[in-house]
A protein has these predicted regions:
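Binding-site signature for planar aromatic cofactors or substrates
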Residues: 1-123
Length: 123
C-alpha cells in the first residue's frame, strides 16, 4: 500500500471521535456506537465504556472486537466511496487503580472533554 493511503487512514483515525464497535457474544454479533481516542503512534485505541453497557460485559467475556471508523455521509452519489478503516484486535481493560489509568484518562479528556462526567461515575 502506498504512503498516501496510510496517511489518509491515519488522518481519518485522528480527526474523528466516534466509531462503531463490533463484539461477539455466544456466536452472535453486536454493535454499538462509541467514542474513542487513538494512541499518538496509532498503536492502540482507547474506548471508555460504562460497566452498565452490554458491550462492555460482552468484551469482558470475549475481548475479540473490531472498530469501524468512517467519514460522515456527505450525500455523495457513491456512498461506498466514503473513507473508512476497520481496526481489529483484542480489548484490554485498564483498571481505575492501574498505573496506565491516569494517562489514558488524560488522553481521553484532551480529545473529548465532554466525557468528564462519564469518568466521574462509579461504574
Amino acid at each position: 500500500m502506498a504512503t498516501e493511503p496510510h496517511a489518509a487512514l491515519a488522518e481519518l483515525i485522528r480527526t474523528h471521535r466516534q466509531a462503531t464497535l463490533a463484539v461477539v457474544e455466544a456466536g452472535q454479533p453486536y454493535t454499538a456506537m462509541v467514542s474513542y481516542v487513538e494512541a499518538p503512534d496509532l498503536s492502540g485505541i482507547l474506548i471508555h465504556l460504562s460497566s452498565l453497557s452490554a458491550h462492555k460485559r460482552m468484551l469482558l467475556g470475549n475481548p475479540v472486537c473490531s472498530l469501524l471508523i468512517c467519514e460522515p455521509d456527505d450525500g455523495r452519489a457513491e456512498v461506498m466511496s466514503l473513507a473508512r478503516v476497520n481496526v481489529q484486535g483484542r480489548a484490554a481493560l485498564i483498571e481505575r487503580a492501574g498505573a496506565d489509568y491516569p494517562q489514558a484518562k488524560a488522553r481521553f479528556l484532551a480529545k473529548l472533554p465532554s466525557a468528564a462526567l462519564m469518568f466521574s461515575l462509579p461504574d
